[in-house]
Amino acid sequence: MNFSFVPLFLVTLILLGVVSNNNSITISATILLLMQQTALVQFVPLVEKHGLNLGIILLTIGVLSPLVSGKAQVPPVAEFLNFKMISAVFIGIFVAWLAGRGVPLMGQQPVLITGLLIGTVIGVAFMGGIPVGPLIAAGILSFVVGKG
């Protein structure tokens, strides 16, 4: 009889997500556990192949939607010349580049995702963090362990 620790790990993530009030991890782990334990398991390779790209698309839509709703305005060109705006642009570029380093690392060494998720959950639960970390954390990790 083969025993898989994956369901136990997913249940642990669900519990940690509930305790840390991290809905992203709670919902994601719940959906994956349901998929794994039902006939929906046939769609796991599809999620594995396209899930990250779809998630980034949804995140980008969420970030851009205040522009469309009018809650945020595109600043005039002159405002792009102050220190805060220039800093924001360069930090945005750096963070996007950093996350870009993380994606290949997560693909080449998927076992590291487990550590990144555990660290993210601990950071949210006990350090007042927010769950936006896995891609950035993977980018930082790529400096520590090498790009691939």
From Swiss-Prot:
Tell me where the transmembrane regions lie.
13-35, 50-70, 80-100, 121-141
Keyword tRNA processing listed:
no
State its location(s). Cell membrane
Instruction: List, alphabetically, the GO terms of the cellular component aspect.
Output: plasma membrane
Bilayer topology term: Multi-pass membrane protein
- Print the keywords alphabetically: Cell membrane, Membrane, Transmembrane, Transmembrane helix
Transmembrane in keyword set: yes
Spell out the family assignment given in the record's similarity comment.
Belongs to the UPF0756 family.
Q: Mind telling me what this protein is named?
A: UPF0756 membrane protein NMC1845
Give the species. Answer: Neisseria meningitidis serogroup C / serotype 2a (strain ATCC 700532 / DSM 15464 / FAM18)
The record lists the lineage as: Bacteria, Pseudomonadati, Pseudomonadota, Betaproteobacteria, Neisseriales
